[in-house]
A protein has these predicted regions:
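A conserved helix-loop-strand patch within extracytoplasmic ligand-binding domains
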Residues: 103-152, 251
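Short helix-initiation/N-cap motifs at beta->coil->alpha
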Residues: 60-71, 158-186
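Short, polar/charged alpha-helical segment
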Residues: 37-61, 68, 72
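Ligand-binding "clamshell"
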Residues: 91-103, 117-118, 190, 195, ...
């Protein structure tokens, strides 16, 4: 009886150790990345065959929100994520007491303001209803875009963490509503203006370069990063993914696929 159990236990232990080491069988190693659907998961799909040549099976888990991709990396449900800017990551780390780190910058998504009621920002009426993201980083990003257009004045127009409390002048008496970023495209039929992250704008069928009444210029500092943990940032698999994301093939894909709505950051 014991002679049978001991080899069986050893076999189970060996299988368990193999599963936790990231192996996918046949010498292939897995790497799992959390991402939002557009453009992040689309870009990762293009990277997949590049990593396959390196013996890495890239697996992508798509999320619809901006919280779970970070939570999953912290809790080691996934290895990395690819969806966020540095200001957003810094705010998340500060609020949650986490220590996620940037691996490499990949692309920029110029942030835009959209309307289904008006064709020009000059048509925006007094007391217009405006929806903006409720997370600190993108909330500030929306306000900075409005301030640059002169629709509001901020206490410090260079502060990347400005809030509604920092508005010192609001000549058009804009009425703000703060919502989760993913919800903003759904508000277009009921509000005068919605400030929307490009990934959600693209998913809603909007073309930022044609449909946005206001849009950040190409010098936007809001690069989207591949993000990991201190314990895996130097993992060879992670470094190979970072190199692939900054490859000429991916740069060409971004330029040809998104026509300026998404820009390479390398």
């Amino acid at each position: 009886m014991n002679r049978l159990l001991i080899p069986l236990f050893a076999l189970l232990l060996l299988v368990g150790c193999s599963a936790s080491s990231g192996g996918a069988g046949n010498g292939t190693q897995t790497l799992t990345v959390a991402a939002t659907a557009i453009p992040h998961a689309e870009i990762l799909k293009q990277v997949k065959p590049l990593l396959a040549k390196e013996g890495i099976d890239l697996q992508v888990r798509v999320f619809a929100d901006y919280v779970q991709p970070n939570v999953q990396v912290v809790e080691k449900g996934v290895d990395l994520n690819y969806f966020e800017t540095k200001p957003y990551l810094d705010a998340f780390n500060r609020e949650r007491g986490t220590h996620l780190v940037v691996i490499t910058g990949v692309h920029i998504e110029p942030f835009g303001a959209y309307s289904r009621k008006y064709k020009s920002i000059d048509q925006l009426p007094d007391g217009a209803s405006v929806t903006i993201p409720n997370d600190p980083s993108n909330n500030s990003r929306a306000l900075l875009l409005l301030a640059k257009q002169g629709l509001i004045t901020l206490k410090d127009p260079t502060n990347e963490m400005s809030t509604l409390k920092d508005i010192t002048a609001n000549p058009k008496h804009l009425q703000f509503r703060q919502l989760e970023a993913a919800m903003l495209p759904r508000t277009l039929d009921e509000v005068d203006l919605a400030l929307i992250n490009t990934n959600y704008a693209l998913a809603a069928g909007l073309n930022p370069t044609k449909d946005a009444l206001l849009i950040e210029d190409k010098n936007s500092p809001y690069v989207n990063y591949l993000v990991g943990r201190p314990d895996n940032q130097n993992d060879p698999r992670v470094q190979k993914l970072a190199k692939a994301l900054n490859s000429p093939e991916i740069k060409a894909f971004i330029e040809q696929k998104y026509h300026g709505a998404v820009l390479p950051a390398f």
